[in-house]
Amino acid sequence: MEIAGRRVAGVWAAIMSTILSKSEIDAQVRSLGVLVIDDSQYMRKIVRNLLLNVGVREVYEAGDGVSGLEAIRTLEPDIVILDYELPMLNGAELVRIVRSPDVFPLPHVPIIMLSSHADRTRVIEASQLGVNEYLVKPVSAKSLHDRIISILANPRPLVRVGDYYGPQPRRKFPDPIATPRIITEDTPAE
């Protein structure tokens, strides 16, 4: 494989061959069916318009967690965008049900959580539930498009660890109790 006039071999050739072109990404975005679950009709309209503006052609809507869960089951969307705070069944409860492969038929559907809460604990909780991406309202077309591209271009495998079923974490967090190791020139290699 050649990139910028240079021959690339081995691992780099494999990596570069998996990178999607802009036209391939645009085609994938156009083929998506996205379900928006939010109790605010105004917010659903905003997200729907943002999705249509970035090229998504099929946008479905649900106004609460229970109808959203049923819509996931029946419509089988490619991506779900849901509000954290929903009536009848909140976003966290909905994600727990969807990410239960023994109970729910589509545990693999990518989920983007929308919330007006930007605090770290809420983001961590959503991540621990199995959310693929987390966006804070108000959301821009660019940030929503970037998250969709992230899901399409860099899909993370689903893993089951204990009670968790969801996308593999992007990185491991260091153990806060572990003793830091100071490395100097004299430190022996492990």
PLM regions with names:
Residues 87-88, 119:
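The feature encodes the CheY-like receiver
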Residues 61-79:
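Acidic, metal-coordinating helix/loop segments flanking the phosphotransfer/catalytic sites
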Residues 83, 115:
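Active-site residues of response regulator receiver
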Residues 41-60:
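Two-component/phosphorelay signaling modules centered on CheY-like receiver
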Residues 21, 25-27, 150-190:
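CheY-like receiver
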Residues 48, 93, 107, 118-133, ...:
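Alpha4 helix (beta4-alpha4-beta5 surface) of REC/receiver domains from two-component response regulators
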